Amino acid sequence: VLKPVAIYPDPARTNGALVMCEVMMPDGVTPHPSNARATILDDEDAWFGFEQEYFFYQNGRPLGFPEQGYPAPQGPYYTGVGYSNVGDVAREIVEEHLDLCLAAGINHEGINAEVAKGQWEFQIFGKGSKKAADQIWMARYLLQRLTEKYGIDIEYHCKPLGDTDWNGSGMHCNFSTKYMREVGGKAYFEALMAQFEKNLMDHI
């Protein structure tokens, strides 16, 4: 059973809507085992800033890669400008994606070319645990739907180029709670980091 939990204006359709749903068991109350959203401890005072990295892929390789081998080494692509660095359809796509997100009411904060050729990043800011998570998922969906018309795929895999020197992708997560913002203090943050450290390797 699908349970609507968030709704966004669909920028591709007049008077259309995009509806985020949770998957529930037939009783309509029990979350399905695949329903990770239902496990989130919602906190409206928690703020999140997501930095989603990804690759554009075309014909089985990152956009801008030659048919054989690799492009020029990493370095000038990061926040790059100019045809040799980002001179393909990527910039057009990321700008259009930004506009689509804003039209859908998603708090899209920015874009930049990343370290590897064909790799980009967008940033989403949200207040509230579930609301922030919903926004990043919907932003991903809009990006993948957008690139269909360009004949391009999106690759979110952490190391799509395997064991090479080429950069991988991740999603940095910046966060704060009301207590962190209003009280904070060195002792509190040291205690917080100590708790994170206990499960460091599990997260990695």
Question: Where are the model-predicted features located?
Answer:
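Glycine-rich, acidic/polar active-site loops that bind/position phosphate-bearing ligands
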Residues: 1-204
